[in-house]
Amino acid sequence: MPVISIDNLVKTFGAIRALDGLDLRVEQGEVHGFLGPNGSGKSTTIRILLGLLRRDSGDAQVLGADPWRDAVRLHRRLAYVPGDVSLWPNLTGGEAIDLFGQLRGGLDRQRRDELLQRFDLDPTRRCRTYSKGNRQKVAIVAAFASAVELYVLDEPTSGLDPLMEAVFQDEVRRVKQAGATVLLSSHVLAEVEALCDRVSIIREGRTVESGTLAELRHLTRTAVTVETARPLTGLDALPGVHDVHEVDGRTHLEVEPAHLDELLGQLVRSGVRALTSTPPTLEQLFLRHYGDDPAAGPADGPVAGAGSAGASDADSQVGAPQAGAR
């Protein structure tokens, strides 16, 4: 049974249809990337999965339960990290972490202390003195110090420096190795590419692609750079070959995977001296869907001002009690 199962999910806010028949499957033990621009429906979906919003229609199951009816029980089995963490200003970071842990039924004290050291977080400081990055660390430590079945991470590394991002990635790999499942929503495509087993790309409230990176790469073109002994002619006429041009004596082009064999035959006949073939990156797959409209529509949900480049479109709606414990 999938850890997360969504079928034909619909959610509207007045005249705005934030989710328009969304489908999503997240399997046990996988790290699943959840991608889309601001306004695509990512955070609305996550809020439904957390039991913070009620769906209009369709089906949503988390760990075999209904997230709206069984929210209290589910919150003891999952951990949530938003992209903009709000904390109680008069508590210390350590007190906030412990409170989040209590909401989930406790945390591993040894893991807590190890994570505080790894993330270089001073737990004795008041939360009001923390930078954005340190507030993120509080939620991340609280989440990863808990032995839960599901981690829901919505732009979790927003505000972290590259060293801390590397520590975060190590922790995701650790919980995966321990058998947990991770839903990771992120604008850092390199992070998703490094961590995720499968990826779902959504737009305007619908899933437009879902699969492993290898599967999705078959849906786009491969970049080829070649140097030959004899001039290349007629490449533009080959099926599936695009954007042929020369730079410094080398021919650059893109080819659809189904036509790669035919292209290679033509190249060999011209005497290949050097050839490099580069599969598409996750960023290229993403831009295939959003390159014509990077902003991709209105804000996700009814809250004005939510969403900016590099941050989740509903982060600011998540209050302190949910920051590390939902």
Regions found by a protein language model. Give the residues of each.
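ABC transporter nucleotide-binding domain
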Residues: 168-254
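Conserved ABC transporter NBD signature motif
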Residues: 54, 58-69, 73-74
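Short, charged/small-residue-rich alpha-helical element at the C-terminal edge
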Residues: 221-293, 302, 316, 326
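Walker A (P-loop) phosphate-binding loop of ABC-type ATPase nucleotide-binding domains
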Residues: 37-41
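Catalytic Walker B motif of ABC-type/P-loop ATPase nucleotide-binding domains
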Residues: 151-155, 160
